[in-house]
């Protein structure tokens, strides 16, 4: 783990990367609202698709890479999420008029107080 080793003492959480967390760990099962990035390696892209589809529908699914790639096309066609966002992390906050409020387990149906 890379980050602030004294986070519990000063109550500040610096951006933190957790390498290869257990698939059963809280960081892999719960929604994370903080500067935490779990990084988990996969042997092949089939395993990525299987992992996504074996869990509840995500509020958002972030893809970093070429949107014309076969992998992006597979994510788009073979998975389901509240939003599929490519090469961006703040898309939902860019325009307050976007009618996005989530789906599935974490969705609440409305956004921006409307």
Spans of model-derived segments:
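Short, solvent-exposed loop/turn elements at beta->coil junctions and helix N-caps
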Residues: 2-8, 89-90
């Amino acid at each position: 783990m890379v980050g602030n080793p004294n986070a519990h003492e000063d109550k500040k959480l610096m951006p933190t990367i957790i390498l290869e967390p257990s698939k059963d760990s809280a960081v892999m099962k719960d929604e994370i609202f903080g500067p935490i990035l779990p990084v988990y390696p996969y042997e092949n892209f089939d395993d990525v698709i299987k992992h996504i589809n074996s869990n509840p529908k995500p509020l958002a699914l972030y893809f970093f890479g070429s949107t014309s790639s076969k992998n992006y096309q597979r994510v788009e066609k073979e998975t389901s999420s509240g939003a599929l966002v490519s090469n961006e992390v703040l898309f939902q906050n860019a325009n307050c008029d976007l009618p996005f409020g989530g789906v599935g387990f974490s969705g609440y149906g409305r956004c921006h107080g409307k």
